[in-house]
């Protein structure tokens, strides 16, 4: 089975933005604009969660849809994969800020006594 990399998927989304193909789904998303793209990213995120609860086949399918829509979003916003890779690289070996917050575990450290 042929495979496609994230980079290829991004390049495909970029190509479709630069050279629209009338009638294509990708062109439809770009024509509708950011709000439509964001709505689709939200829908696909939910479907990934539901797919994960069901089975791996559904998880893989829905994750592929989400990745496609994320690439369209990145292109729409002018964010490159290198921007994402740089951000990920900047996090290597660093403790997440989330771990410094008490509420990430549900602790009520900052809650006032009643």
Swiss-Prot record:
The EC number(s) attached to this protein equal 3.6.1.31
The biological pathway it contributes to is: Amino-acid biosynthesis; L-histidine biosynthesis; L-histidine from 5-phospho-alpha-D-ribose 1-diphosphate: step 2/9
One GO biological-process annotation of the entry reads: L-histidine biosynthetic process
Molecular function via GO: ATP binding; phosphoribosyl-ATP diphosphatase activity
Q: Which reaction does it catalyse?
A: 1-(5-phospho-beta-D-ribosyl)-ATP + H2O = 1-(5-phospho-beta-D-ribosyl)-5'-AMP + diphosphate + H(+)
Q: Which domain of life is it from?
A: Bacteria
Q: Which residues form a coiled coil?
A: none
Give the Pfam families listed for this entry.
PRA-PH
Compartment(s): Cytoplasm
* Primary enzyme class: hydrolase
What cellular component terms from Gene Ontology apply here? cytoplasm
List UniProt keywords, sorted A-Z. Answer: Amino-acid biosynthesis, ATP-binding, Cytoplasm, Histidine biosynthesis, Hydrolase, Nucleotide-binding
Q: Kindly give the NCBIfam families that the UniProt entry links to this protein.
A: histidine_hisI
Concerning its family, UniProt says:
Belongs to the PRA-PH family.
According to UniProt, the name of this protein is: Phosphoribosyl-ATP pyrophosphatase
């Amino acid at each position: 089975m042929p495979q496609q990399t994230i980079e290829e998927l991004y390049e495909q989304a970029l190509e479709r933005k630069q050279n629209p193909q009338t009638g294509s789904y990708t062109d439809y998303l770009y024509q509708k604009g950011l709000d439509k793209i964001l709505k689709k990213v939200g829908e696909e995120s939910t479907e990934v969660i539901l797919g994960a609860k069901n089975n791996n086949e559904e998880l893989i399918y829905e994750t592929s849809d989400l990745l496609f829509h994320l690439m369209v979003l990145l292109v729409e916003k002018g964010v490159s994969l290198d921007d994402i890779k740089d951000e990920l690289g900047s996090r290597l070996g660093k403790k997440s800020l989330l771990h410094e917050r008490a509420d990430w575990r549900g602790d009520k450290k900052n809650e006032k006594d009643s």
